[in-house]
From Swiss-Prot:
Signal peptide: none annotated. It holds the Pfam family DUF1508. Residues 89-111 are annotated as: Disordered. This is UPF0339 protein ACIAD0721. Keywords: Repeat. Belongs to the UPF0339 family. Duplicated subfamily. InterPro entries: DUF1508, UPF0339_domain, YegP-like_sf. Sequence repeats lie at residues 10-58, 61-109.
């Protein structure tokens, strides 16, 4: 099964999306958006940019845990990964976003 996006609304009324792999694991999380349409535009940006390796910023957090950001052509962060135990597992996470990011399936959980 291929991955999908989920749009949800936080208690403060803001929206975010996540990209899930086929196994249901969250592989990318967006920032918070004031408007649902902005979150939908963020999904479109992931769909457009996820297959381009140059759009991935490979980082290491202060706690020495590797993670990555996916950036748009304008260098704005579209989504951020979880923290990984190793650079190898982070790189597998990037491959998962590349494989699942182009999916057109969006589950709207905002009710």
């Amino acid at each position: 099964m291929s991955g999908w996006y989920e749009i949800s609304q936080a208690k403060d009324g803001q929206y975010r999306f996540v990209l899930k792999a086929g196994n249901g694991e969250i592989i990318l999380t967006s920032e918070l958006y004031k408007a649902k349409a902005s979150a939908e535009n963020g999904i479109a940006s992931v769909q457009k940019n996820s297959s381009d390796d140059a759009r991935y910023e490979r980082l290491v957090a202060k706690n020495d845990k590797p993670y990555f950001n996916l950036k748009a052509a304008n260098h704005q962060v579209i989504g951020t990964s979880q923290f990984y135990a190793s650079e190898q597992s982070r790189d597998k996470g990037i491959e998962s976003v590349k494989n699942n990011g182009t999916t057109a399936t969006v589950k709207d959980l905002t009710g």
